[in-house]
Design a protein with these regions (language model features):
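N-terminal flexible/basic segments that precede or flank functional cores
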Residues: 1-35, 99-111
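Short polybasic/polar patches that bind polyanions
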Residues: 17, 42, 53, 83
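Short alpha-helical DNA-recognition segment
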Residues: 46-63
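DNA major-groove recognition helix of helix-turn-helix
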Residues: 66
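Short, solvent-exposed alpha-helical "recognition" segments
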Residues: 69-74
């Protein structure tokens, strides 16, 4: 029996860039922020209804957020939601790392 050879493309580590999205960096940022928001919601054991009241948005929008359907949420709005869950958000701008071709945007969580 002959063996089949399977070719696999090596990704960049950024699924949005690999899929060719023009706004890959923004999508990655929104996903990182949503991940942190969902962690905070889970840590506080909040229901979607309770989160909707805190954020002042309809509960179905919270369902979208919990399921990472983020088209209706800007990164600024997600940052605002994080502050509504009693967290400070600090933005730090520093020189890019020498091993990167361009600057990066990332979300870091402090203890």
């Amino acid at each position: 029996m002959a063996r089949k050879t399977e070719l696999v493309d090596v990704g960049t580590g950024d699924v949005f860039k690999d899929l060719g999205f023009a706004d890959a960096d923004e999508r990655k940022l929104r996903t990182q922020l949503a991940m942190r928001l969902n962690d905070l919601i889970k840590e506080r054991k909040l229901t979607q209804t309770a989160v909707a009241v805190i954020f002042g948005i309809p509960q179905p929008h919270i369902s979208e957020l919990r399921n990472y359907k983020l088209s209706r949420f800007s990164s600024e709005r997600l940052l605002h939601f994080i502050t509504q869950l009693d967290r400070d958000v600090e933005i730090v701008i520093r020189p890019k790392a020498s091993n990167h071709a361009a600057g990066l945007v990332s979300v870091l969580v402090a203890a």
